[in-house]
């Protein structure tokens, strides 16, 4: 990388990390078993702090005192959250409103490329809660898996994570600033 260009140095580090992740994934596909920490380090350059489960007991005790009802905590938390379930016939409108609000708050701080947009789709039979399929040209397909409960908090969480300032915004800006602005073609591979 060029000594005077910090962005070029970051590009070099990014590409190096991508190669490390690809090598790690190839090792896994070839049957090598990695510890959780080694997998996280190889794929994400992250070192997770693995703590004994008992470290979480004080936090669980605080939650236990806050969540109403009787019985196991997990059942009570689920019953509490179910009070915020979005009826099926309202999910589209609520998701669109949540994403619109996430976008409004994002563009107040981060200008988005002109013409950026997304298509919202509800799907089943997936292993994930929500997904952003970046299509290029500042467009995304945002999918929401309705096999899982669609609750109010999830609508906002997915709106932020998959949309704004999440994957859609991130990829549109990468395409605009790095692929288009600098000619860095690796940011056109999705």
PLM regions and their residue ranges:
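N-terminal maturation segment of proteins
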Residues: 1-190
């Amino acid at each position: 990388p060029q000594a005077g260009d910090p962005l070029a140095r970051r590009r070099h580090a990014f590409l190096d990390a991508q190669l490390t992740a690809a090598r790690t994934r190839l090792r896994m596909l070839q049957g090598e078993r990695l510890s959780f920490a080694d997998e996280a380090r190889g794929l994400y350059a992250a070192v997770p702090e693995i703590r004994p489960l008992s470290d979480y007991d004080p936090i669980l005790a605080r939650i236990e005192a806050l969540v109403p009802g009787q019985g196991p905590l997990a059942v009570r938390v689920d019953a509490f959250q179910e009070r915020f379930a979005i009826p099926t016939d309202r999910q589209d409108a609520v998701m669109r409103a949540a994403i619109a609000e996430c976008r409004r708050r994002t563009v107040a701080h981060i200008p988005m490329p002109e013409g950026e947009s997304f298509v919202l789709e509800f799907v089943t039979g997936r292993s994930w809660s929500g997904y952003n399929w970046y299509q290029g040209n500042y467009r995304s397909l945002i999918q929401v898996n309705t096999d899982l409960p669609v609750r109010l908090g999830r609508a906002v969480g997915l709106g932020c994570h998959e949309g704004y300032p999440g994957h859609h915004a991130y990829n549109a800006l990468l395409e605009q600033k790095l692929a288009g602005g600098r000619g860095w073609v690796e940011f056109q591979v999705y």
